[in-house]
Structure formats: structure tokens, C-alpha cells
């Protein structure tokens, strides 16, 4: 069988019928798999010497989370270098990247493979891979026919990447206008929750607003900060990271704002702080809720006026810094308890983002597992690391209280265990290789983190916030003022006075 004009026209029509790029990509490879009667097809994007799966058909779901480096996959490297159709013989010594990843045939090797590099002009932007268990499957199709398919796919991918680039505001003022693929930030996931988060990141990235990123421990808040920075006009300048929880009080101010020689014992020279390092760029303050009230006041001044003072220096320095902050605490409760400044909270949370916990991300668990499996494979020098069907079900049924970080550690541990019990360099992860426990402390929900009262000014915002927290405390404590005061960690007399001022009691 060979391609007819009708078949090629059908493929082109399918590319136009999809709603959104992802749907078009999926239609393309599904149609190709049917036309070619092969066992698996995949559309991959090329970036930084690796191929990133965009859509698959006939392959295990975790393939979408894997990142295939050229160094780790000789067949994909051959496709990237070829510039034309690549046919791998059935007896090729080069391992297939999808060995063990075709459902129902995990123990069998892929026999026939065709690779089609995709170009935008002279730039490699991706590849189509076609795999079959029958060695002669692709012999009836000529190279010219396969080139036509590659041209259709390359056009669709090139247009999609260009639109993505424009939508993400990567065509910045003063840029050359040359097409450049978007750099990946490893925010892996196709669930509705992650899709919504990515949309919100796109919305806020092009602005200069401060962003407060909330979410449970281990959800990937730092990746969100990186994604915002890389998609912003400040991407050409530094993204500076500071973990506020790891700062001793004695050096915290110096870390943030710098110091001059002789400012304190041990200050043997002038030193720039994180704000100076991030000038014209972005400063990411992780665990912002751990800062002392004194430092919060100084941070607020920087956000308000854009100037800093080094420790021991009376002069002010102007800085242009965008601040991204992250926390796993409910800062509204921290404000009411007097541990976090209300004015700073509202300054930071101009555009709040909430990173969903892994248990709310559905099949993203499997995609992330595939990503970590591929990392382990490269790190340990293994030929392949795959998940058994039972292991996939086990991962999907678990609650993941430690979120993505727990999944990463679980995969790494399982690979080590599986490798120890099986000879050779091929590892299959089974259910028994995972020892999972769901003991975890509660964390704030998306609703509690994102809810901000509508208001006209900071004072009104603060009073509305305090009023709502007092109402909640009273409702939860049967309107017992003493119990409510204890819950809010304040004196009952002060609570009465505050409630009276806010109009909650006569």
C-alpha cells in the first residue's frame, strides 16, 4: 500500500479540524498510525539536544513525561543528524527509545522504526517516529511519500510553536524576530489543574506584577517561578533565588540588601545583596512566611519605593526588581496571628497563583513518573527503566501527601531496589518496589490561599480580612469569644476591642 492523494488530503484535513494545537497533534499521529498500520507513533519537539513528546498513540502514557536526550538515545540522535527519512533495519544494534513502552508488549523489542526529522527553514524543530513489531511494515512506503508526511507535520508544528512563542510574549521589543522554540521549564502535566495554572502563568508573565505562589510542600513552586521569569521581558536578566527559611536572623538583612566593609564583625569587604544581584531581573523569595517582622518592614519599603540600603550604609541604591514569593503557609492566618504584615501580604499577592497538589492532578502522576524514570536511566547508565501496568495503577491510586518531591524520591528508590534484584541493565518497576505512606500534615487549600476580598484600598482590605477571620473563628467556636481568641492566638480583650472597631459587636 502507498499514499494516495486522498490519504494525504485526509491528513491535511485532520490537521485543520482540531481545536487547539494538542488536539491537532493527536489527530495527526492517530491518523498516521491508522494509515501506516503501525503499532506506535509519536510527535516530538526538539529543544536543547533533547526530544520532548507532544503527542503519542500506541505508547504507554508515561512516554509523554519522558525527555529523550540525544546522548542517551542513539536512534533519536541519528534522526536529528540525518536531515531526511531514517529507516532502522530490524537487526539494528541501536536500542529503540520505546522498547518496553508499547502496552501489552512490554517484554518485546520494537522491530521496525522510521524517523522523520521536522524542520522550520534550516532549524530542526522536532521529529515523527513510527514503530512496528513487524519488521517489513514500512517497506511499501517510499521515502518521497514519507517526506510529504513530514512536511505536513513540520508545517503544523512550526505554526504551533510560533503561535506559542507570540502568546508567551517571547517576541520582545528589540528582539530579532527570528523564530526560536520556547524553552521548557519541566512543568510536566496535562491535567485541567495544570492547564489552568499554565494559562495563569502566561497571563501574568508578561506583566511586571509581584506574584505570590502558594501550595503544599513539594508541589513545584520554584518551577512556577522559573516559568514566570523565563516567559517575561526580564528573562535576559538574572533570576536570583533566596530561601528565607534557611536564613539565620543575624545575616538575613545582609543577604537581602548587602553590606559595606566594617558594618559588623566579619564584614571585611563590601558585598552585594540579592536585590542588587537581581537588578533588572527577578528575585524569588521562597518560604516568604519565615521572614521576621522587622525584615518584612524593610522588604515592604523596597516594594513601595524601589530603593535599598546596604547594612552599615546611609546611602540608598535604586533597584528595579520583580519579586516572586512562595509559601506553603496560609498567610491570611499568619496576618491575623500577627506573624505577617497585612500590607506586605497585599503587596505580594497582586496576582496569587496556587500550585495544585499531586493528588488533584490525575494522570499527571504517570507522566511525571516517566520523567523521573528517564532521569534515573541516564544517571545510572541503564538501557531502559519502565513501569509495569501494576506499578502505574499503584502510583495512580496513591494520595501523594509529599507531592511531586515524594514521587521523585519514590521512583529513584524503586529503581535502585529493582536494579538490585534483577541482573542486567534493564529495569522494570513493579508494585512491590514502592513503599508508600500517607502520613502528612495539612496544608492550605487553593480556596483559602487565593481568596482575596474585593476592596478599594489597603486599609479597607485589611479590615475586611480581619472581619472575615473573626467571623470564621466565632463560627467554629460556637461564638465563644475566649475560645475564638485562643484559636486566633490573641488576647480576648484585644479581640473584643478589634471586633468593636470593626463593627462586629456593640
Swiss-Prot record:
One of its GO terms (molecular function) is DNA binding. Keywords: ATP-binding, DNA-binding, Nucleotide-binding, Phosphoprotein, Transcription, Transcription regulation. Residues 481-500 bind DNA. One of its GO terms (biological process) is phosphorelay signal transduction system. CDD domains: AAA. Required for the expression of anaerobic nitric oxide (NO) reductase, acts as a transcriptional activator for at least the norVW operon. Activation also requires sigma-54. This is Anaerobic nitric oxide reductase transcription regulator NorR. The lineage of its organism: Bacteria, Pseudomonadati, Pseudomonadota, Gammaproteobacteria, Enterobacterales.
